[in-house]
């Protein structure tokens, strides 16, 4: 059952706050968590009812798939049906970090995460709070940005509270996000990698690890939907770096450095 009014807790990112967030996720509730990119609304990715609450809270179309967050490759069993070689190269180069890799979907991912697709987006966040909650809960979690659909992506707990108070169970306040833009999304399920969304890793940097990356393309005369890619508003050349000024206007307080492997620690 989805409640329409909730007394949203705001918890510090200490041991007690992490334990409370993990408990709520195991109970099928929604919790906003900091990542290195932006704050996300997390739900157990194997619990379809919990994942459905995300769409209600955000006012997000259900045909827009969600990204599943894990701590590392050891959690991929059941979430993906295979790990393509290019995915392995990208994970070795950039994970944990602000990269989402589209892979063939496994049987344990809730259908609600995937919007009818046979693929799933996988990300391994580097933020210590997000990782601690995954480990404490034992849950891979689906987590889009913790804002109302169409609003700027939140980079502080205060931003999340403004949009999500009364709609989710809890917010874990881990301070401002370091990267401040969403993860780069690369699809490795085709003949060559495709950029679905620019973000914290530049397309040229990703291409160096996985081979030349093509643009998001259309099928049947319409743009491919999902994972926030349609919001970029323009194409990014596969060999040219992402310029911060192209995206800063879409994010509250996005001022941190764009990601490089040296910043992962």
What is the meaning of each model-derived region?
Residues 2-265:
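Active-site-adjacent structural elements in enzyme catalytic cores
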């Amino acid at each position: 059952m989805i409640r329409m009014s909730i007394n949203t807790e705001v918890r510090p990112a200490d041991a007690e706050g992490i334990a409370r967030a993990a408990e709520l996720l195991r109970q099928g509730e929604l919790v906003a968590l900091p990542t290195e990119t932006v704050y996300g609304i997390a739900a157990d990715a194997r619990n379809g009812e919990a994942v459905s609450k995300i769409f209600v809270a955000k006012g997000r179309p259900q045909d827009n798939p969600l990204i599943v967050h894990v701590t590392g490759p050891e959690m991929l069993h059941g979430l993906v049906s295979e790990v393509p070689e290019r995915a392995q190269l990208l994970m070795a180069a950039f994970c944990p970090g602000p990269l989402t890799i589209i892979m063939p979907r496994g049987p344990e991912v809730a259908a609600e995460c995937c919007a009818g697709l046979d693929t799933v987006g996988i990300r391994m966040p580097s933020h210590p709070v997000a990782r601690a909650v995954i480990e404490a809960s034992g849950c891979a979690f689906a987590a889009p940005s913790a804002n109302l659909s169409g609003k700027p992506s939140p980079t502080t707990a205060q931003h999340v509270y403004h949009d999500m108070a009364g709609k989710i169970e809890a917010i874990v306040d881990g301070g401002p996000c370091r990267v401040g833009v969403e993860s780069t999304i690369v699809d490795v399920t085709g003949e060559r990698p495709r950029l679905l969304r620019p973000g914290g890793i530049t397309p040229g940097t990703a291409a160096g690890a996985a081979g030349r990356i093509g643009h998001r393309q259309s099928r049947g005369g319409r743009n491919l939907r999902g994972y926030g890619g349609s919001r970029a508003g323009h194409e990014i050349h596969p060999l040219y770096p992402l310029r911060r000024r192209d995206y800063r206007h879409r994010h509250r307080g996005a001022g941190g450095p764009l990601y490089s492997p040296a910043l992962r620690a």
